[in-house]
Amino acid sequence: MTRIAMLGTGLIGGFYAEAIQGHRGRDRIVSVHSRGEANARAFAERHGVPRWTTDLAAAVTDPEVDVVIVALPNHLHEAAVCQAAAAGKAVLCTKPLGRDAAEAKRMLDAVERAGVFHGYLEDLVYTPKTLKAVEAVRGGAVGRVLWVRSRETHPGPHSDWFFDPEMAGGGAIIDMGCHCIEIARAFIGKHVRPVEVVCWGDTQVHPIEAEDHAIGMVRYESGAIGQFEVSWNFRGGMDLRDEVAGTDGTVWLNHWLRTGFEIFSANETAGYVAEKSESSGGWLFPVGDETKALGYVDMFTEMLDAWEQGTSPRETFYDGYVVNAIADAAYRSIASKRWEPVEIEDWRGGPTTEDDRGRREYDAEHWLIKRERLPDGRDRVILRHKATGELSQRAVSAPE
């Protein structure tokens, strides 16, 4: 049995508890920590946790604990991670890893110095749809990835600290952009270095200092673009969508709204519908199993399997550090209104090997620009001469 200490009793801690207990059949939360006694006691009762405490040090040094899960507000991550690593515990930390790259790097250094297992809990790269899509893309289904667009929008976070940039590290970018950035990396390839970022962000609705809306583009060394769209101003629920465009294909993913499960109710009697849902009447978009749909189940299954087997999980603290470095560049770009470099101290990926930007040869003299089927059954090919650059087109027999 894997014995887990849960640090944090908020919404994310509850989702984690539901996903962990019972799915592999051998994982148990044996201790929960909260800064408030009432929250700790209530969480323990709700999830069948035998012990609770308000003492962080006691929670992470408990000899009956194997794995520590950090599900605390962002400004508390570093202290919890460093104490758990010093105690020799495996550490899993929620997103974002740090409030900025410097904080994330200190946490990465702490777990690596201690030699403990570490996992970055980026659940949205573990959704069933995303896992299947990444497998298809890695298998060549869309050719070379050119562009990934990831969107997460909803009416705003569930706790007050999210709106405080000192506690959170920023606004919608650090809250949701971290999801979108890592989703794009999963499709483009985490070995491909992020080079620079351009980003717009502003506070459009809420009386706060943090940005509540942002759109950014990340340019990668391969030429691929990762685009993120995040907002705390979207009404009607939570919108989670991803798109991948490649030289040979396209992927569209819709994870939350309009997924094929819709209910209309003339009465306000539906109760809880789904995370960030704003109504319980009219057209509703329920989710059958939120912990599965949001990736929590597959994430913890993979993480805890990797811990038992002594292997690295799909997402480590290094990934969290890279995400923070990209987010830092986005914030600098908002201020400078220009492209800003992504500053990574120790890049562990590889050099880009796609040096021809995906050019396709038609014959010895021409590059193929486009091929399309005509109404008469033949194909039209549009070509560029390799030597002169001259453009031409011709109708040819369709391939059998």
Regions found by a protein language model. Name each.
Residues 47-110:
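Beta-loop-alpha module in the N-terminal Rossmann-like domain of NAD(P)-dependent dehydrogenases
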Residues 178, 206, 229-237:
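Glycine-rich phosphate/pyrophosphate-binding beta-alpha loops
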Residues 220, 243, 248-315, 340, ...:
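C-terminal glycine/acidic-rich active-site capping loop/insertion
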